[in-house]
């Protein structure tokens, strides 16, 4: 029963990611909301989460494979969570907080010899800081933050249920 539950959870996660990407493309095409750089990063993370979850649902792996898929989904969801969190911070930060952030990021990019990214960063950081659309008073990056939080919590169920199962069998002398 455990594997059937995790397979269903992975399928739900892939369905949620596909729905989110569909809504994002609808908002871009029908409403005219152009995505910024951080929005594109979040879209890539949603696509990666969806593909990974769909592969896990179709593959129906054993306990070891479920752990691996769960860990991969957790890492990708945490990366998306970082991108969405950064965009939410950019939207709530004041101008005096944005300038040192952009300056520090420019220094890091120049150390990495990514000077061509600096001009794009300057314009995109200000573009990402704009709140262009809300639903129920919540902006799109905040919705993404909520979705990535759910996607990060979802793989914890298989990971911790496996851990509790392992601890229970170890206490009985099963291993």
From Swiss-Prot:
Residues 27-44, 86-142 are periplasmic. The chain crosses the membrane at residues 10-26, 45-61, 69-85, 143-161. It comes from Pseudomonas syringae pv. syringae (strain B728a). The gene is dsbB2. Disulfide bonds join 36-39. The lineage of its organism: Bacteria, Pseudomonadati, Pseudomonadota, Gammaproteobacteria, Pseudomonadales. Keywords: Cell inner membrane, Cell membrane, Chaperone, Disulfide bond, Electron transport, Membrane, Oxidoreductase, Redox-active center, Transmembrane, Transmembrane helix, Transport. GO terms for biological process: protein folding. It comes from the Bacteria. The keyword Protein biosynthesis does not apply. This is Disulfide bond formation protein B 2. Required for disulfide bond formation in some periplasmic proteins. Acts by oxidizing the DsbA protein. GO terms for molecular function: electron transfer activity; protein-disulfide reductase activity. Its main location: membrane. It is found in: Cell inner membrane. It is a multi-pass membrane protein. GO terms for cellular component: plasma membrane. Belongs to the DsbB family. Residues 1-9, 62-68, 162-175 are cytoplasmic. InterPro entries: DiS_bond_form_DsbB/BdbC, Disulphide_bond_form_DsbB, DsbB, DsbB-like_sf. The keyword Electron transport applies.
